């Protein structure tokens, strides 16, 4: 999965898919009442990126739905996965559950079209703080209460704060998520700073273990050719990047073209990939 980073305006969906992304990451900001309000990263953000692009969340979700609905004039068949980077630091731990419920209701209305021929992309809820695991509980409960529990088949989970893996596993379990139940594990840091792959390798080992909790591992945010090669050699499933074309180029190199390929819609993002 080539994951286009910081896609916060609708026009950027086409921009990143044109560069080779089959997945995007979008930043979600909340108001004081725990309601998702707009897509926005803000400063600081990655080097060589403009941090201030934004869209009202309802508008963005409608644009995203069109980009991922077969038959729509804006449809991009390549776009199969969306990571919502949920800026829950604005929420209190006690408000996280409410935030999750409200976000599920918003996705149901504006992205899934009330469960009637909505967008087809898989969704990952990416939360920076393990203390906010109740966001996941609220999200899941809202879909169950609205009789759309079937949509949870399209939803996965990630904690992005580079916490200890055992602590993340515990937080997921508290949220009602079983081991290897649609779990993506991220590791990374802004592209302005170098980071070693020690924790990535630990996560990959967990993913490949019979008693691990992880389905997929992704690394963020990189675009240097050497960093991309190192990440692929560490056997990650996804790479988040500002330059999807760099990942495409590396995948076409002799060392990688027979080991990796781009994921398609037929590839289940919740299944462990075995060579």
From Swiss-Prot:
Its EC number is 4.6.1.-. It comes from the Eukaryota. It catalyses: an N-(acyl)-sphingosylphosphocholine = an N-(acyl)-sphingosyl-1,3-cyclic phosphate + choline; an N-(acyl)-sphingosylphosphoethanolamine = an N-(acyl)-sphingosyl-1,3-cyclic phosphate + ethanolamine; a 1-acyl-sn-glycero-3-phosphocholine = a 1-acyl-sn-glycero-2,3-cyclic phosphate + choline; a 1-acyl-sn-glycero-3-phosphoethanolamine = a 1-acyl-sn-glycero-2,3-cyclic phosphate + ethanolamine. It is found in: Secreted. Binds 1 Mg(2+) ion per subunit. Gene3D superfamilies: Phosphatidylinositol (PI) phosphodiesterase. One of its GO terms (molecular function) is lyase activity. Dermonecrotic toxins cleave the phosphodiester linkage between the phosphate and headgroup of certain phospholipids (sphingolipid and lysolipid substrates), forming an alcohol (often choline) and a cyclic phosphate. This toxin acts on sphingomyelin (SM). It may also act on ceramide phosphoethanolamine (CPE), lysophosphatidylcholine (LPC) and lysophosphatidylethanolamine (LPE), but not on lysophosphatidylserine (LPS), and lysophosphatidylglycerol (LPG). It acts by transphosphatidylation, releasing exclusively cyclic phosphate products as second products. Belongs to the arthropod phospholipase D family. Class II subfamily. This is Dermonecrotic toxin LruSicTox-alphaIV1.
């Amino acid at each position: 999965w080539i994951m286009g980073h910081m896609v916060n305006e609708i026009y950027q969906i086409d921009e990143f898919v044109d560069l080779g992304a089959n997945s995007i990451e979008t930043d979600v900001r909340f108001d004081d009442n725990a309601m998702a309000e707009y897509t926005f990263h803000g400063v600081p953000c990655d080097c060589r990126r403009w941090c201030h692009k934004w869209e009202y969340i309802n508008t963005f979700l409608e644009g995203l739905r069109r980009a991922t609905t077969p038959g729509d004039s804006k449809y991009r068949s390549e776009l199969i996965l969306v990571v919502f980077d949920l800026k829950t630091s604005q929420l209190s731990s006690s408000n996280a559950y409410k935030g999750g419920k409200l976000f599920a209701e918003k996705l149901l209305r504006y992205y899934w079209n009330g469960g009637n021929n909505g967008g087809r992309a898989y969704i990952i809820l990416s939360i920076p703080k393990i203390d906010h695991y109740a966001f996941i509980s609220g999200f899941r409960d809202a879909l169950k209460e609205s009789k759309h529990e079937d949509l949870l088949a399209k939803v996965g989970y990630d904690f992005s704060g580079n916490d200890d893996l055992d602590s993340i596993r515990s937080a997921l379990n508290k949220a009602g998520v079983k081991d290897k139940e649609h779990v993506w594990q991220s590791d990374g840091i802004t592209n302005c700073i170098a980071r070693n792959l020690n924790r990535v390798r630990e996560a990959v080992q967990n993913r490949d273990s019979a008693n691990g909790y992880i389905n997929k591992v992704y690394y963020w945010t990189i675009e240097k050719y050497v960093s991309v090669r190192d990440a692929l050699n560490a056997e990650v499933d996804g790479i988040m990047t500002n330059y999807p074309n760099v990942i495409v180029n590396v995948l076409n190199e002799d060392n990688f073209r027979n080991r990796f390929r781009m994921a398609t819609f037929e590839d289940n993002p919740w299944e462990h990939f075995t060579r």
